[in-house]
Every structure is written in C-alpha cells, then in structure tokens.
Amino acid sequence: MSFQTLERERTFKNPPKDGTSFPDLQKAVKPHVDSFNALTNAGLLNYAVKEIGEKCAFDSITQEEGGALKFGNKISFRVDEVQIAKPMLSSRERSSINRKVYPAEARERLTTYKSRLVLKFSWSVNGGPRQSEMREVGMIPIMVRSNRCHLEGLSPAELIAHKEESEEMGGYFIVNGIEKLIRMLILPKRNHPTAIIRPSFANRGTSYSQYGLSIRCVRPDQSSLTNTLHYLNNGVTMFRFHWRKNEYLIPSMMILKALLETSDKEIFEGIVGKDLGNTFLTDRVELMLRAYKSYGLYSQTETLQYLGSKFRVVLGVAEDLTDVEVGRFLLQKVVLVHLREAKDKFRLLLFMIRKLYALVAGECCADNPDSPQHQEILLGGFLYGQILKEKIEDWLNSIRAQINLDVRRSAPGVDFSDRKYLTRVFSKINNDIGTKLQYFLSTGNLVSNTGLDLQQATGYTVVAEKLNFYRFLSHFRMVHRGAFFAELKTTTVRKLLPEAWGFMCPVHTPDGSPCGLLNHLARKCEIVTHPSDVSQIPSLLLSLGVDPPSVVGHESGWGCVQLDGKIVGWCTYKLAKHVADVLRLMKIEYAVKLRNGTATEPAKVPLDLEIGYVPPSHNGQYPGLYLFSNPARMVRPVKHISTGELDMLGPFEQVYMDIACFPKEIVPKVSTHVEYSPTNVLSIVANMTPFSDFNQSPRNMYQCQMGKQTMGTPGTALRYRTDNKLYRLQTGQTPVVRPKLHNTYGLDHYPNGTNAVVAVISYTGYDMEDAMILNKSAHERGFGYGTVYKGESFDLSQKRRRGEPVVHHFGFAPGSTPRREWLQKLDADGLPFIGIKLEDGDPIVAYYDESTGQNFIETYHGTEPGFVDEVRLLGNDVGDSECQQIHVKLRITRSPIIGDKFSSRHGQKGICSQKWPTVDMPFTESGMQPDIIINPHAFPSRMTIGMFIESLAGKAGACHGLAQDSTPFIYSEQQTAADYFGEQLVKAGYNYHGNEPMYSGITGQEMKADIYIGVVYYQRLRHMVSDKFQVRTTGPIHNLTRQPVKGRKRAGGIRFGEMERDAVIGHGTSFLMQDRLMNCSDYAQSWVCRDCGSIISIMSTISMNGVGSASEVRCRSCAKPALGLEDTSDIWQDGSGKKFVGGTNTTLIALPSVFNYLTAELTAMNIKMMLEVK
C-alpha cells in the first residue's frame, strides 16, 4: 500500500474529465438514485396513472318511477401521462441565456431544488372523442444527480465547475437549502405468502385463532396492498384487507367463488390435491365448503353481485356501474393485486389456504418476519413515486368533487362540452401537488388517505448531515426497521440473525434505544432497482420437466414453483432441486457471455434472479421453489466454485446454500460458493476500523458511532455551503495505518483525524478514568485544531405581510447618523465587514424602514466570539426585486481545551484533562516525546488489542515511510500481526514489542519499566466543552414549581439527580444537598398547624379586638365556630365575617416551593397530607 500523496495532489489540480476515480463510492448511493430514475426510466409513473384509472361525474341524476336511476351527461377524465422537467429558471426571468438551475444555487439561496410537474389531462363526454391538455400542477423537488438533475453524468472536473464536490454522489433532495434524504425502511418481502403465529389475531372475534398468512402484494407502480388470511377454529378461513385505513373481512370461499366460475369439487382438489390421506386437511376444507352454504351464493355472478352491493359505497365507484362490475372492481383493486389474471389469483389463493392449514396442523413452522429472508427494502424513489401517485389521484378526486358540488348547487354554466367550464373547475381546486411533496421531504410526515400500506406516518426523511464524510456516507447505507418497532418492549426484533450475513453489517448499529433497529448495509450488498425480464422463465421451466399450473389437483408430495408470487408449475422436490441448479448455471453462463461481449440474445435467466429452493423438512419452512426477480431486493456477489464466476445471491436463497468464508473452508461436493473477501460482511464504516478482528466487539460498535461524531473534513466545496453548523478539522492527516478500502473509497480526500505519538503510562494523576494528557507543544503545533462554521440568515420579507410594498432595506436610512459602535462592525450597506470579530451583543446586520426613516440592527448572540467568513446576498427566483435576504457565515475557532473529547479508532474515548508543558513530558532515548499520554488501565477490561497492533504498525510505518495495511482477517495464528510489525521495528532499530525506555520529564531519571509507545490515529470528537458548559447563579424559574428551568440556551439550572445525591452523601457532605436542592432551588417559607399537621388549612385572620395576637395565621381546620361566650381576645374572624376560636397553634417552617404545589395537587385528589412538626 502507498499513501498516494502525489497522485492525490495531481487529482486535485487536474480532476478527471472522463469519469469518477472511485466507482465503489458512487455505487454505495446507487440504490437511491436509481430508484428515483425508475419513476421515468422504468415507467413507474405511467404505471401509476394507469392504475388510478378514470374518474367520472354526471350533470344530473334523477330517480324514475320504478326506482331506477336516470343519468344525464357523463364526463370521464383521467391522467394519461406524467412529465417531470429538469430544473430551469422561471419563465418570468427573460435576461439569462443559460437557463439551467444547479443544486449549488438551491443550497446557497436556501431554496428547494425543484422542477415543473406537468400532467396530460384528458376527458371525454358520453364516450365521445377524447380531448386533452397539459396541466402544470406545481414544482416538485428533484433528487440530486438523478436523471432529472443537470449534474447527471458529469465528470469530476465538470462537477467542480458547478460548485460541487469532485466525487458528488447525489441521492438526496435539497429543501429550503437543507439536504434531505428519504431513509430506507425494512418491509415484508413482496408477493410471498408468509406464515404467521400472532396471539393478537385471536382477539379479532369469536372463533379466531392465532394462525394467519400474510402476503404483501406489490403492483407494477411499486404501490402495495397487504392481504391476510385468518384461520378460524371452525375450519373456515377469512380474507382481510385494508381500504383507505379501514379494515374489512370476507370469507375466503366468497373470494374464490367470485374469481372464477368454479365448483366445490375444483376448490377441494385445488387445496387438497392427491393428498386425500391427510384427514386434518380434508376435514377443514369440507368444513369451509359447508359453512359457505349459508350465504346461498352458488354462481360467480351471484357472488360478484353480492360483493358489489356491500362495497359500492366503500369503494366510491361511479353511480352507473352495476353491482357485478363493482364486485369485479373490488377483486381487481384489493385481491392479490400483483396478479392480473383471475385464474392466477385463484391458484395462489388456493395455495395460501393449503399453507395456512399446514401451519395449523404443524406440518410447517411460522416464517420469521424479523429475518432478512422475508424482508426487502423500501427505497426512497419508490416511496416518492407512491406519494406522487396518491396526490395525483387526490387531484382527480377534487375535480370530481367540485363538479358534483356545482351540479348539486345548480351552479350556472355547468356544461361538460364547454372547455371554459373545466377551466373554471381548475381555478377552484388546489393545483399545487409540488408543495405537498415538499412538505413530506421537509418534515418526514406522510399525509395520506390510504396510509400507503405502511406502518408509520412520520420519520421518513432525515437531514443528510455533513458532520464528516463518514456520517454523510452512512446515511445512504442506513436501513431502519420502522418507528413501530422502536416502541416495542420485546427485544426479538433487534436480534442479529445468521440470515443477515453479508446483507446487514453485524457491527455498525448504534448502542442505546435504536440498537438493532437502525442497521447498515454491508459493503457489497446491492439493492435491485429495476425489474428483470423473466418472460422466458415459464417456458424454460416447462422444458425442464415442471408440470404446468392447473386448477385440478396436483400430485401428493409435489412442490409448488412460483415466480414473483405467481404459480408457474408443480414438480417433485428432487426435480425442483435440479431445476434450481440448472437455472443458477444458466444465469452465470449468460453473465460470462455478457462480460466477454459474446451474448447475442437476451438473457433467459437474469443474473439477479433469486432462486430460493426450500427443501422438504419436518416442521420446517414450507417447501417449494420460489423465484424472485422484482425490485427492492437485497443481493450480494459471491464466487461460484464450480465455474469460478460471480453469482448474485439474495437473502431468501442464501439460507439453504453452503457458502465458505475462506477458500480453505470449502467442503468438496458440499460447498457451492465462496466469499470473495471475509470483510464483505462489514459496512463501509466498520471496514475502516483497523485490526477490528483483534478487538472486543462492543468497541468496534462504539468506533462506528464515534467515527461519525468526529470533527473531520465534511467536504472540499465548503465555500458554497450554507449549513446551519459545520465542523472542520484544520490539521487533518491521512492515517499511517489503514485498510485497503480506505483508498478504494477515496477517504484521503476527507481526513478524519491526526496521527499522534501515544505513550501508555500512568504519568500524572490527570489520566485517570479514560482521561488523556495532551502535549502542550503538540497543541501549539496544531494538533486537533478545528473550526466551527455557523450560518445565520436574515430575511426582511418576513417583517411584512404578503402583498404589502417593500419598506425595509439593508443599510442605514438616508440622512440618519448611525452610532459609532455600529460603524465599527458594519459597512455603509448595513452588512458586516468580512473578517470582523463579533462578540455577544455586537451588531451583525443593519436595516431601516423607509416609511419612518428609523434604523434597526440585528445582534449576534453567542457565548464565544465569531469571525464573519462570508456574506451572501440572496435574491428571489426571478431576480426582479430588491435583495431582502442575506446569509452570514461565521467562523468560530475551536482549539482543543481541557474537557474536549478525543478517541482512537478502537472505541477508546476520553477527554483531554490537561495540557502538559513539553519540558515536563517524558521522553525516549532518541528525544521523542509523546503527543498523548493515556492510562494503562484503559486496556485490560476493554480488550482493544487492535489499538496495540495499530501502535506497533504505526510506529513501523512512520519509521519506514509505509502505509500499513490494517484490513481485518489477514493475519492468523501462524502469521501473526505482532511478528510482522515487530520485525519491521527491529529493522528500524526499535524493540520488537514496541516498548522503549523512557525518562521522566521532571527528574530526568530513566523509568524502571519500559513504556509502550507508538503512533495511533486519533480523532477529535464534536463533543466540546464550549458547546456544553453550563453556569447559573440566578435566572428564570418555572412559574408553577418555582424551580430553575432546564436548558442551556435558557440560562437554566444543572440537573442534580440521584447519582449526584449519592455522591454527596458518600462524601459525608449531606448538608450540601439542602443547599443544592432547596436553598439554591425553590426555597420557600410556609405556615403549618402543629396540631393537625396541615399546610393547606392555614389562613390569615382578623382579631376581634383589633389588637394583633401572638399568631395572626391560624388553622381553619382546627378552629371551632365562636358561640359568643368566649373571651373577645380569643375570637377571630375570616375574610367573610364568620367568627371562630382556636387553631392558633401554628408555626413557620422552610419547605421547597414544589412541596406546596404537590400538597395542593394531592388535596384536589382527596388525599390529605399531614406533617409531624417537632
């Protein structure tokens, strides 16, 4: 390995003009970009509008004498085509020659990168000739580097010319200047019936059991609908579906009878086949057939008519459709929607019933919905297309609703043949679909009438933070299980399953609440985004001996062959195994021809076809041969042993295959595949941990998180970014010790830390509990020196209502005399000088009101000084009005101070506890002084041996000028890392084990023990004292509890919790607790009755003789009404004039104010609190 320093320098000076230098980096984001491209390239939007179909309305509906409805003129309308343009300047802007709008402009102007959405709207009246027109329905956000972005296909040199990173990957949207990403979610595998045992199913009604079968059916436009079969204890199965967030149940027999003109015998044979000896199965089918007789529906027409009459109102169909047509519409829209033909739906439903009965009988086990075998990925582009489809349908529904409203109100001019009438309808409805999509991206909230067959309504988008490049890249490889699962108390969904090998990284997941729910794709895991051509598969299967599908019963002991949820045949399990092997060889052979350029015809078997052969077993998974070619599947490359060629595997088929991790693990005639590299199981970020195979696993997990929290290099085009907060490491270095993949992904473009000389020694008392001592001279030379950039925007247009004239302008009012202190910071145009230092309260921008001639300033609010780095003037979309908005970027210097957090790449985090003078630092024989000193106690319990190895390797690499390879799994017990790097150290004249004699910097004497010293790559994390320190003497308090409010920004108090309480007691300073928890918090004085112990019944009173008694505060509860016989001096009265005696035994005590509040709350609940006063 080499550092590639000169090559990198040449690349920066002369960026490539032909293509990317790091194809693997672009490939990491490919699923996001390709899924958005599929909206137009794969015709998903055209499929969507075809699926929406026609809407219709009538200009009159009257009821005739027989009860029949008479319809007037009928208008039928639909959307024929969807067009998404590329972002261009507004047509109102007429001066520009180049009219393209690039993402950099949207970032800098804090606007949305969007383009026009145009629909081809067509209509006909009474079935006459069809008319059409193009309607613009708003501006929709566009994904960066997609086929609707001007950056598509640009080389690094061209990207730099357009103010982008040289390796800009895209895959995100820009909304109001913020980069937003639709994150990937896990969904159930499409078009595959999944057996489920769920106790909650039994709560749905009488006779319902815990057994069910679910299938998530996906249409060609990628919208989905989940169908569920329920098993009832009386043998009947019920078919469940959702329509517009409402749930409906229909007997499965009714669906079967409605799909085809069939007989009970055909249904019996279709479920049972030739397996007549299975009495459990035959009894249940017979019970189901008998139970259906109660409906009295025998023919297909009768059944369709019955369904149509029940669901007419629910479906909201046209009034002129018959009940039979409504029934057919129901079957088309909600029953196994991935299949078009009724006979295919019929066959699959029979198979599902058969599998459900097998689950109940214990012939097969329930499928695990938490296993990647039964999961797929919801891609951002597909979700975006589904939302767009629903908004288009809502738009059509709003047109129909407006026409119906006009007809009901007998509005003048309702004439379907008049084009002007439709124009008036369009003017009355909301034609802006783009704003709804922009709202979705900016908030992540899904506003939907149907719910889109998803389990959550929020949390779909995240900000693609550029804290550092690791964090930015991780966003695109992140896969979330779903918000619903985060609330579950069970940990089952979080478990790492063996089926995830090679698809989900076992290391890269957060610790804490999202652990196991927020995962990341393995490095080589890809996601299919386009459906493959499998039109030749059915005929190929028939030629291999598979029996064609038929309604009549299949042989006993035969397995079902399915292709994307469609039954394509039946065969024996032995033949199914043979067919699976043949298909695999055929797809590999075609891939070889394709690579060699010898392919002359389309592939019969596409390379990414998933061939899932499930063998028969005892109480195992339901057997069969399942083929999948649809999008959103995870696939990964492995090496096929017999041919030596690449094969793409999916998680469904991998479970039943024998894949060796290393070539030496291959078992002859058993292993079929071998991994290309054992590191392919890890994510990109997890692969960057050096020698991760030497570390305890939690430490590798911690490093994956801390690597993304590092103050690093977010990018090279920082001049053109307007982030709210941006961190930058000024003295970033390339690591001496790094894996080969560090160069593969070009991470030297974005350095994330600094190489430091680290000594492991307990030298002072300042290195306890993971603290580290920093060499003061290393700090002065720039170790860990960083900068924080903060952006502030000032918009004068928000100071006026829409439509009002512009009266506010930047600068000072003509003829006015600004203050001298303002002019020290601000120029004559009211904007700050570049490079000026701003303290808290200093003016940052000035503006004036031309109507009053008054000057105003906006001040800088910050706890630390900032320097004005850039000032941007932001115009509007057309550029035809005065500048009303500016953006100021502030540079805040952050050199490391005591309390700032650092970490190595092995999860060894700690804070800087002291900057030690270099004259007092220990030194080696050669005069080398460590940059960092850490305590030896950091290692025994953490077992981060990888950090020892890195120290050895870094020291040897620095001596020889080598970039050391730290890829995991390359060393073994026969060839150890310690030997390899130890010999390099010996050649450089150092100790084999990395130890050196060191001399005390205070006494100059040699230390008795040799000290372990070497070079380790250290990261400075973003957790800094400057952002977190909190001091309070007095400040705002809560109006109810009278305690200090919380929050650093609000000058709030510091939390004193149970651990702090225990520490104070443990140190024998318990009186400090009273000071902290009461005297300095909510100290209050309150009167209490000594007799009854109440603080609620105390009241101020008036003495009858007018002379103040010993206690003017008395207890109303202990007092008795005065009878007039008592001494006048003992009688007192309350505010209403009632006279009492007694209740004088009260005293003043100190209490927390919140205790009074608690007492009042308990009293409201009829709970009396009594205090014992001594």
Curated annotation (Swiss-Prot):
Q: What class of enzyme is it?
A: transferase
One Pfam entry name:
RNA_pol_Rpa2_4
Q: Which GO terms describe its biological process?
A: transcription elongation by RNA polymerase I
**Record's subcellular location:** Nucleus, Nucleolus
Q: What is its EC number?
A: 2.7.7.6
Q: Which SUPFAM superfamilies match?
A: beta and beta-prime subunits of DNA dependent RNA-polymerase
Q: What is its main location?
A: nucleus
A GO CC annotation recorded here is:
mitochondrion
Looking at the keywords, is Transport present? no
Gene Ontology terms for molecular function: DNA binding; DNA-directed RNA polymerase activity; ribonucleoside binding; zinc ion binding
Q: What is the name of this protein?
A: Probable DNA-directed RNA polymerase I subunit RPA2
Record organism: Schizosaccharomyces pombe (strain 972 / ATCC 24843) (Fission yeast)
Taxonomy of origin reads:
Eukaryota, Fungi, Dikarya, Ascomycota, Taphrinomycotina
Q: What gene is this protein translated from? A: rpa2
